[in-house]
Structure formats: structure tokens, C-alpha cells
UniProtKB/Swiss-Prot annotation:
This is Conotoxin Mi15b. The modification Pyrrolidone carboxylic acid is found at Q50. It holds the Pfam family Conotoxin. It comes from Conus miles (Soldier cone). Belongs to the conotoxin O2 superfamily. It is found in: Secreted. Residues 1-23 form the signal peptide. Its main location: secreted.
Length: 85
């Protein structure tokens, strides 16, 4: 029973230290711009991944990545379109 009480007290102390440490970090104004910059970078990277890259099949130009257009590749019958520069 004593071991359980000690373990509970240690857990409470550790949680208190963690909560105090997190609230102290939120007060630093320099950390927030980094956080927003990270989110913006992440959004840009996700947006970049959603486009179709060079050499991959496409149906319309807007789905291709920037500076690429959906062009016919190969035979004169034009059965395959791919994103090209």
C-alpha cells in the first residue's frame, strides 16, 4: 500500500512539473512565429504533393504541378497524356 501511495505522489509531481513547463513555454513570444512558420511550410508541402509531377499521366493541365502542362505523349492517336514542361 505504501508503494502505491509513493507511486501516486511521484506521478502527481511529474505531471505538475510537465504542466508548469508547458505553461512557461507558452509565454515566450519567439516560439509562436516558429510554430506558425512550421504550419505554413507544412501546408505548402502538402499542396505541392497534391499536384501531378512531370512524366505522370494527367487529364487536364490544372492537375499538373506549376510550370507543367498536360500534353499528348507518344503515338499520333494520342491515347496517353502526361504532365510535361
Amino acid at each position: 500500500m505504501e508503494k502505491l501511495t509513493v507511486l501516486i505522489l511521484v506521478a502527481i509531481v511529474l505531471l505538475t512539473i510537465q504542466v508548469l513547463g508547458q505553461s512557461d513555454r507558452d509565454k515566450h513570444p519567439k516560439r509562436r512565429p516558429r510554430q506558425y512558420a512550421t504550419k505554413r511550410l507544412s501546408a505548402l508541402m502538402k499542396g505541392h504533393r497534391q499536384c501531378t509531377g512531370a512524366g505522370f499521366e494527367c487529364e487536364e493541365t490544372p492537375e499538373c504541378c506549376p510550370n507543367l502542362t498536360c500534353k499528348c505523349s507518344g503515338s499520333p492517336l494520342c491515347t496517353r497524356y502526361r504532365c510535361k514542361t
